[in-house]
Amino acid sequence: MQTHEIRKRFLDHFVKAGHTEVPSASVILDDPNLLFVNAGMVQFVPFFLGQRTPPYPTATSIQKCIRTPDIDEVGITTRHNTFFQMAGNFSFGDYFKRGAIELAWALLTNSLAAGGYGLDPERIWTTVYFDDDEAVRLWQEVAGLPAERIQRRGMADNYWSMGIPGPCGPSSEIYYDRGPEFGPAGGPIVSEDRYLEVWNLVFMQNERGEGTTKEDYQILGPLPRNNIDTGMGVERIALVLQDVHNVYETDLLRPVIDTVARVAARAYDVGNHEDDVRYRIIADHSRTAAILIGDGVSPGNDGRGYVLRRLLRRVIRSAKLLGIDAAIVGDLMATVRNAMGPSYPELVADFERISRIAVAEETAFNRTLASGSRLFEEVASSTKKSGATVLSGSDAFTLHDTYGFPIELTLEMAAETGLQVDEIGFRELMAEQRRRAKADAAARKHAHADLSAYRELVDAGATEFTGFDELRSQARILGIFVDGKRVPVVAHGVAGGAGEGQRVELVLDRTPLYAESGGQIADEGTISGTGSSEAARAAVTDVQKIAKTLWVHRVNVESGEFVEGDTVIAAVDPGWRRGATQGHSGTHMVHAALRQVLGPNAVQAGSLNRPGYLRFDFNWQGPLTDDQRTQVEEVTNEAVQADFEVRTFTEQLDKAKAMGAIALFGESYPDEVRVVEMGGPFSLELCGGTHVSNTAQIGPVTILGESSIGSGVRRVEAYVGLDSFRHLAKERALMAGLASSLKVPSEEVPARVANLVERLRAAEKELERVRMASARAAATNAAAGAQRIGNVRLVAQRMSGGMTAADLRSLIGDIRGKLGSEPAVVALIAEGESQTVPYAVAANPAAQDLGIRANDLVKQLAVAVEGRGGGKADLAQGSGKNPTGIDAALDAVRSEIAVIARVG
C-alpha cells in the first residue's frame, strides 16, 4: 500500500466518524519555546488548554513534524528521522478513552475492503500507564486483547507531554509484532525492534509545568475538560503495510537512496555499514530540508536557519564520502518533490524556489570545503614537521567549527596522509560546545516570560483590543505586576499599588494600544487615572502580548498612584500611531512591488515597522540590480499616489487564501483571519496590524538600500512619510553643495565626480610608478654596495618612502637577483610616518647551505623593533612598532651573519 493511500484511509476513517479534517500547520509556529512543530497536537494546544473554543468537537489531521535533537544518530540506526508525518485524531471534550480505543482498533484491524489497514489482531500489543486500570479494561473489552498483550510502563514511557509546559496525560501505545527475525518474544518491554510502535493514544487530561526530564516536572492540575490526542507515525505504519525492514525502504525514502546510488555507482544495503549510513543521512536530510525551505526557512547561522544549513551540509558531506564530487542537491530536491508531491502539493508549486535555495547552499559549502582542504593540508604538514603522527583534537575541532570542515573528511584525509586524528579530544571539545549550547538554550527558555504569574488573568479572558476603531479607551486595571510578580490588591494610599517613579506592568481589560507583533513595534501613549485617582498618570513604553490574548503595558508611573480595579483612560500617541501605520502600510506596498518586479518567489522572511521607517526581509538569491531597485521604488510610489482605499475585513482562513491573500510562512493563523486589502489585487495580505485608510497617507517611500542578511535572504530598508521627505531634502542639500564646490549644474555632478576620480587614480598610478622606479634604483645601488662578511654578501638597509610589506618583498626579489649565486642575504626595513615598521629578510640557496635561514634572522629584527615575524628559510617577514630600533635591528643581522660566517 502506497503512503498516499495510507494517508487517505486514515483521514477518510475519521471523517466518516464525524471528525473535521484540518490541514497540516507549518512546521514553524510563533512560539519561543518550540523550534519546530514536533507533534500533531501542537496546533490544537489552545483548544486543549481552554484558551480558545474549538470550532469543532473532534478533528483529524496529518501534521508535518521535525525533531532534530538526535540528528547525529540519523542513519546510524534506522529508527531516527528528522522529519516525520504524524497522523492524529483529536477530541476536545467529546469522546475519551473508550472512543479513542474503538476508533484506533477499527482502523488497524478492519479489512482493506472496509477501509481499514487489515492488520492481524493477534500481532497487536499495547502498553498503558502503570496505574491506568481503565485503559487495561477497555483494551480487553473493545479489542479482546489478553492481559499478557497489555503491558504497564512508567511515566517516562507512558505519560506524554511536548517536553515543555502545556497539556499532558497518560498514554496507551499500540505495537505491531514484526516476527521473531526482528528480536526475542515478550512484548515491547523486551524488544522495541520486534514490537514496533505504530500509534500512541494520549488521554490528555492534565497540565504540566517546567521540568528537565520526562519524569521531573510538576502536574499543575486538570485541564478544563478531558481530551484525546493520538499520533500515528505515517512512516512507521508504512513500513508495516509495505512489509519492509525500516522506513528507509518505504516509498517515501527509497527513491532518494536510489537517486544517490545511481550517481555514486555504489549499491545500498550490501553489507557496507558506513556507506549505508551515508545513504540514509542523505535520504532523511534531503526530505527535511525540502520541507523546511518550503515552509519559509533559509540557511543561516542560528536557530532554524542553522538547523537547515547543518542538514544540507551533512547531505553534501555524505555524498562526497560516497565519492560524489558533482553537484547533486538539485537532483535530490527533485526526487523528494516526486515522492512527497502527492501529499504536499506546495513542494511541487514552490519547487523552483526550494531547489534554488538548496543548490545555492551546496555551492557555498563546496567553496567552504575547498578552503577547508587547503587549511587541512597546512595543519597536516605542520603536524608532520613537528614529528607527530596524530592531528590534534583542537585542530580537528577548529576545522569543523570555524571552517565547517566535517570530521569524517578530516579522518579520511588524515588517513591518506599517514596521520591519525585525536578523535577523543575532538569529541570532548564537541561535547563541551553542545553543553554550552544546551546551557544557552536553557537560559533563553527560562528567561522567557513566566506565564504562571499571569495564568489567572489568562484564564479569566482576553484583553479587548479597541485600537482599530479608536485611540482613546476607558478601561479597568485587571492586574499590576512588578518584576514578574503580581501586586496584591490594596486600597489607595496603602503600600502595595503602583506609585510615582515605579516601572510596572499594567494589564487592562481593554486597550487601544497596539502590542508588538507582526513586525510592527508597540504603540507609545499614556494611561491616566479617572475620578478620585485622576492625578495618576503613566507613560507607556512598551506593550506585549502574553499567551496571545493578554495585553501587558510596560509603563513608567509619572504621578499619582494606580491600584488594581481602577478605571483608567488608555490613550495612544496620535503622532506615533500615524507614523507606525505609515510604516506598516508602506511595508505592504514594498512587498507587493517586489512580487510584481521579481515574481511570486520574493517571499517575505521578516519585517520591522516603526514610525517613518520600514525594514523588509525576503527570500531571494543575489542582489537586486540597480534597475530592479528603481522599479520597486517606482511601483511602490505609483501605488501610493494612486490613493488606493485600504480595506480591512475578517474572513475564514481558507476563503481568504482562495481570494489570493498572502499568508506568511511560519505564521500561525486562527480559523477567522483579518485581511488587509490595498488597491484590490495590488496588495492582499493576512495582517493584524494597524494601517492608513488610503495609500496616499503613506507619503513618499524612499528605499535607502538593499543588502544580504544571510544565505538566500535579502533586506530592503526605506523611509516613509515625513522621514522620507527629510531624507530627500538632506540629499538635495548635499547635491547642491557638491554642485557649488565643483562649479557645475547639479545634473553634471556625477560626470564631474567620475572625471575627478579617474584623474586621481591616474595621478596615484603615476605616483606609484615613480615611487617604485625610485625604489628599484635604490635596489640597484644597494646591490652594488653590498657588504661582504666572510664569504657572504649582505644588503642590510633601511628603506624610506612609506614602503609596504608587499613593496619590500618585491624589492628583495630584485636585489637578490642582482647578487648572483654566491651566498647572499638581504634584510630591508621600511621607515615612514607611521609607527608600524615592516621588514623582510631573504636568503638565497647558497646562504642556506651555510646554515643561514631567513626565518631565524627575522627574529633578530623583531626583537630590536618590538615586533613579530615568521616565514621560511628563503623568505621571512614581519612588522614592529618601534622605529627607533631600526639601526639596532640591522646591526643584529650583521652580527648574526658574522657569527655564522665565522668572521671576528
Swiss-Prot record:
Superkingdom to which the source organism belongs: Bacteria
Cofactor binding note: Binds 1 zinc ion per subunit.
Annotated binding of Zn(2+), by residue: H584, H588, C687, H691
Gene Ontology CC terms: cytosol
Keyword Repressor among UniProt keywords: no
Pfam families per record: DHHA1, tRNA-synt_2c, tRNA_SAD
Classification via NCBIfam families: alaS (TIGR00344)
PANTHER family documented for this protein: ALANINE--TRNA LIGASE, CYTOPLASMIC, ALANYL-TRNA SYNTHETASE
Name of the featured protein: Alanine--tRNA ligase
